[in-house]
Design a protein with these regions (language model features):
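Short, glycine-/small-residue-rich phosphate/pyrophosphate-handling segment
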Residues: 91-92, 104-149, 164-167
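N-terminal beta1-alpha1-beta2 submodule of the flavodoxin-like/Rossmannoid cofactor-binding fold
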Residues: 1-103, 155-182
Length: 182
């Protein structure tokens, strides 16, 4: 079994990565492989609602959306991580997920999913809610934890200091593993 995780931060080794890594390492202890897919900082287009993607994938082939979709279709579960900007998921993450789910959302039905939000302080709950809506409309069961799936940290490395947040990530991984093994 394998879980594909999306790092929605432009910072490849920032706090969002660290939260996802914590989930992944616990998954590994549960006997489940994982991969962290980095969106990166390259330009990313918004969905234009052309509808052509339902036939051949997203018509924009100059970024990572179609690559992610191919990997996501092979994965057994998905975890999406976002940094929080102005009490909301990053615009890059939303544009990316809009295109992923518009073009391929039905392919993910019955795969468990989870979202992780990382912020200095506020906005994580609102971001968590927005991210989980992608799962809800795509017939995907949502994995939770012992608290909302969030971690606090502003500058890279601060997430390490959020003991409760890191424990929440490990608990999330255990719950996701349980769902995958059912």
């Amino acid at each position: 079994m394998k879980v594909l995780m999306l790092n929605g931060s432009a910072k490849p080794q920032g706090n969002t990565y660290r939260a996802l890594y914590e989930v992944g390492e616990q998954l590994k202890k549960e006997g489940i492989d994982y991969e962290i897919f980095q969106i990166g900082a390259a330009p990313l287009r918004d969905c234009i609602g052309c509808g052509q993607c339902t036939e051949k994938g997203c018509v924009f082939d100059d970024d990572k959306v179609n690559e992610f979709v191919a990997k996501a279709k092979e994965a057994d579960g998905l975890v999406f991580g976002t940094p929080v900007y102005y009490a909301h998921p990053s615009g890059r993450v939303q544009s990316f997920l809009d295109r992923v789910f518009y073009s391929s959302g039905r392919a993910f039905a019955f795969k468990p999913g989870a979202s992780v939000a990382v912020a200095r302080r506020g906005g994580t709950s609102a971001s968590f809610d927005v991210m989980n809506k992608y799962f809800g409309i795509s017939q995907m069961p949502v994995a939770g934890s012992t608290y909302w799936n969030l971690v606090h940290g502003r500058v890279p490395g601060e997430a390490e200091l959020d003991a409760e947040g890191m424990q929440t990530m490990r608990n999330l991984a255990k719950n996701l593993a349980w769902m995958l093994k059912c």
